[in-house]
């Protein structure tokens, strides 16, 4: 049994026609669980993020591990025919093309369903069909329209984008739930189906309780920064090193005296303004100011240790680079090594894999992030094309291999 065959989705084949984050992330989740994922890219340029600077390269590398890449010209008849062959043999197709693009190319769900009635087709768009259905969608569009950006950041600073492509990633997660549901339903009926996942509706659901809050109270809540409206001492605080921060979360009656003891501030515990949860909320700004003044003299690691030893929720505010040296992630097997592209060179890289595990559920790092078209010949050979057919496609520019660019 091969490494992939031991994984839960080893019998699932996926064709991904994706760019940027949402579709690539969706297929990555399936790939980490063992699915055979073929990423279809445009010859010459590939995924948009391949040509979007270092941050784009990071996205391509981190989100396209465990996949094979074929560079295939879908504007050509022979390229579309090859794509049809791939989809005909696949269990799942995932795409995040613009509204109507797949249908205009003749590779949309209706086209592929005629070839493969069992196909599960995930389409990730900005919006579900409706008044906004034809609008272009991207992560910040969803964050803006859902209210997420308005609630992020500190009061008076204006709307702020979340520090990762959260609406893209969320739509991918919902999309994968839909794919797995459709595959389960196919076991009963033998039929595939169209699955719709969107950025705006995903972000809108997450903001649902704030919409309910506005409905209840008649007004929107202001942005929260790093705080929480239900708790008096729940924020990030700068320590004695510049730009080294700690989160502290005092959320129960037990946490409050434990916090005061841990930071050796019995005066705060004795202060009548902070005697009860309600009074602490009434004097939240004063309490936060007093805590900030005290914690500014603490070393970050010493403070976190003292609070955790006292049973008070606390955490260092890490930079992404610190994840790669995190003992917990290392010991739980969450950090993986692979090879990817950086500045025209191949380089050993690290990232965090899909965090799913169970008695018989594993995720594994198997394949490096592919070069554009690295597996074009291999993928078509798996689909029954002989060397002469493949050479002809290369000669006509329908497919591309890295050494022929």
Q: Where are these predicted regions, by residue range?
A:
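N-terminal helix-loop segment corresponding to the beta1-alpha1 unit
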Residues: 1-178, 182-191, 371, 377-405
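Aromatic-enriched alpha-helical interface/lid elements that frame and gate functional surfaces
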Residues: 233-310, 314
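Short, surface-exposed beta-strand/loop micro-motifs that present aromatic residues
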Residues: 61, 232-238, 347
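Active-site Gly/Thr loop motif
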Residues: 221-234
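Glycine-rich beta-alpha junction loops
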Residues: 44, 126-128, 199-204, 241-243, ...
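Terminal low-complexity tails and localization/encapsulation signals of metabolic enzymes
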Residues: 1-13, 222, 238-240, 324-405
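Substrate-binding/catalytic subdomain of NAD(P)-dependent oxidoreductase enzymes
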Residues: 183-224
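Conserved PLP cofactor-binding pocket of PLP-dependent enzymes
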Residues: 308-332
């Amino acid at each position: 049994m091969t490494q992939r065959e031991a994984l839960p989705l080893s019998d699932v084949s996926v064709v991904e026609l994706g760019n940027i984050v949402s579709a690539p992330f969706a297929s990555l989740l399936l790939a980490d669980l063992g699915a055979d994922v073929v990423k279809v890219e445009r010859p010459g340029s590939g995924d948009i993020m391949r040509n979007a600077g270092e941050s784009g390269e990071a996205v391509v590398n981190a989100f396209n591990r465990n996949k094979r890449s074929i560079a295939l010209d879908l504007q050509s008849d022979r390229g579309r025919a090859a794509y049809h062959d791939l989809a005909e043999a696949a269990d799942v197709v995932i795409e995040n093309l613009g509204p109507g693009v797949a249908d205009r190319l003749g590779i949309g769900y209706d086209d592929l369903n005629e070839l493969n009635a069992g196909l599960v087709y995930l389409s990730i768009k900005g919006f579900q069909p409706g008044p906004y259905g034809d609008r272009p969608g991207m992560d910040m569009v969803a964050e803006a329209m859902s209210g997420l950006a308005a609630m992020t950041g500190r009061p008076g600073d204006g709307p702020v984008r979340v520090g990762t492509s959260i609406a893209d990633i969320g739509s991918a997660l919902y999309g994968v739930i839909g794919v797995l549901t459709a595959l389960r339903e196919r076991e009963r009926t033998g039929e595939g189906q169209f699955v719709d996942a969107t950025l705006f509706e995903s972000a809108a659901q997450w903001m649902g309780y704030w919409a309910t809050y506005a409905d209840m109270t008649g007004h929107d809540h202001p942005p929260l920064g790093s705080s929480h409206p239900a708790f008096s001492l729940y924020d990030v605080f700068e320590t004695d090193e510049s730009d080294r921060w700690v989160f502290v979360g005092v959320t129960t009656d037990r946490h409050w005296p434990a916090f005061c003891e841990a930071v050796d501030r019995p005066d705060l515990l004795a202060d009548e303004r902070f005697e009860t949860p309600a009074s602490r909320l009434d004097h939240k700004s004063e309490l936060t100011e007093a805590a900030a003044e005290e914690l500014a003299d603490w070393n970050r690691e010493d403070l976190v240790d003292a609070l955790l030893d006292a049973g008070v929720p606390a955490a260092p505010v890490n930079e992404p680079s610190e994840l790669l040296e995190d003992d917990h992630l290392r010991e739980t097997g969450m950090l993986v090594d692979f090879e990817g592209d950086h500045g025209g060179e191949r380089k050993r890289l690290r990232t965090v894999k899909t965090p799913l595990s169970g008695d018989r559920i594993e995720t594994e790092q198997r394949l490096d992030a592919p070069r554009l078209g690295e597996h074009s010949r291999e993928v078509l050979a798996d689909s029954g094309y002989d060397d002469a057919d493949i050479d002809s496609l290369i000669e006509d520019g329908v497919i591309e291999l890295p050494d022929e660019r």
